[in-house]
Every structure is written in C-alpha cells, then in structure tokens.
Amino acid sequence: MTKVLVVYCSMSGNTRAAAEVVAAGAKGAGARVTPKEGSQARPQDPLECDAAAPGSHDAFSYMGGALKDFLDRAFYPTQGHVTDKPYAAFVTHGGEGKEGKSIESLAQVFKLKRIAPTVSVQGEPARQAIADLEELGVTLAAATRTWGNPPRLVSHRPHADDSLGVAS
C-alpha cells in the first residue's frame, strides 16, 4: 500500500480542513495517509512516504513557520534520498495566496517532483476547493503507484503502431 504524507501549518483551521480533504482523497484512492501538523512531523517522515502534500496558510506571503521549521529539520536527513519523489502543495489565504511559491521553491531544493499545480483556497474550503483538494489527494495516491518504477517491458508480438513493445 502506498503512503502519502500530508504535512501542514494552520492558524485559523482552514488549512487543517484542507489537509483533511487532501487526506480523504488519497485514502479514497487506496493510499495510507499520515496527516501531521508541521510541528509534529519528524525529519524522517519524508523518507517513510511515497508522496507528500505540504500545505500552509498565508504568513505574510510565505509559508507558515511550523511548515518551514519542519522542512528545515528534514532537509539534511533526507538529502539525496527523496529526489523526484512526487509532491503537490495546497495553500489557504485571505486574498493573495503567494505562499505557494515559497513551498514550491523549497520543494525544488529537496528535488521533489511536482505532479500537480498548487491548490490555492481563499478562506474556508468551499465546494470547488473541496473538489480540487480531494482530486489533489487522488493524484498523489496515483503518482505513488508509478514513482521509481520504469516502464515494464512486455513480451508480445509488436503491432505496426507498437514497435517497441513497451507497456505504460
């Protein structure tokens, strides 16, 4: 069973609610999900998951401190061991929603592979945001099935339109 880490920082509860929806989407798609508040996340958590969903509220156009602290603590223990691991971020905000850029920048430092655009939610998650967050979880669960697995060669007689015999 694939594992998805949902790690977040929430001040008003909106990001926690968003994290719960992402987790529900991944669980519904068959993944085992570990939602954690940034201050409770352990530096080795990224090593123990197949995909990650970092999320934060807007903290002056930057990610919240608990998420940043977690990423700081996790960097050296995971360096070189999470390259190309799938991730997709989510953010909540009151108007601008620029904190997603800071999460994306640090994900690049970790060399993670973004598999979906950041879901940006203004205020409390409403109907469309809930659908987008749930889809983010589903996407993460699906990505974990293929991460690190090269295409499988299939032995069959090639057809005219399948000269390589590679299954996806």
Which positions does each model-derived feature cover?
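FMN-binding flavodoxin-like domain, especially the glycine-rich phosphate-binding loop
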Residues: T2-V4, N14-A17, V21-A29, T34-A41, ...
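Short polar catalytic/cofactor-binding loops
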Residues: C9-G13
